[in-house]
């Protein structure tokens, strides 16, 4: 299972939440800092593929938050 698969599984379970990449990393990998950048990269990839919707400006005051794209169905 890849990091992207882990993220999608989490987001399918937490459909109503908007989570930052940091939140996702802490939930999935118990705050292990080594995963933070890989999770952020995977979130960007999933957003570019249309699997995750993103909001926010990406700065410290308004970080990107991710949620399931409305068109994505659970499998």
Residue ranges, per PLM feature:
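Alpha-helical recognition domains of nuclear gene-regulatory proteins
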Residues: 10, 27, 42-45
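Short amphipathic alpha-helical segments
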Residues: 5, 21-22, 40-43
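Short amphipathic alpha-helical interaction segments
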Residues: 33-48
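Short alpha-helical segments that sit at the start of domains
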Residues: 1-13, 17, 33, 71-75
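Short acidic, hydrophobic short linear motifs in intrinsically disordered regions
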Residues: 17-28
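Short, cationic-aromatic polyanion-contact patches
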Residues: 57-75
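A short, conserved structural fragment
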Residues: 47-57
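Residue-level detector of family-conserved "landmark" positions at structurally sensitive sites
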Residues: 21, 35, 56-57
């Amino acid at each position: 299972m890849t990091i992207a698969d882990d993220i999608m599984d989490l987001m399918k379970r937490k459909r109503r939440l908007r989570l930052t990449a940091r939140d996702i990393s802490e939930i999935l990998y118990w705050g292990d800092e080594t995963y933070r950048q890989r999770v952020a990269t995977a979130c960007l990839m999933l957003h570019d593929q249309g699997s995750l919707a993103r909001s926010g400006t990406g700065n410290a005051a308004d970080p990107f938050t991710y949620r399931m794209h409305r068109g994505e169905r659970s499998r």
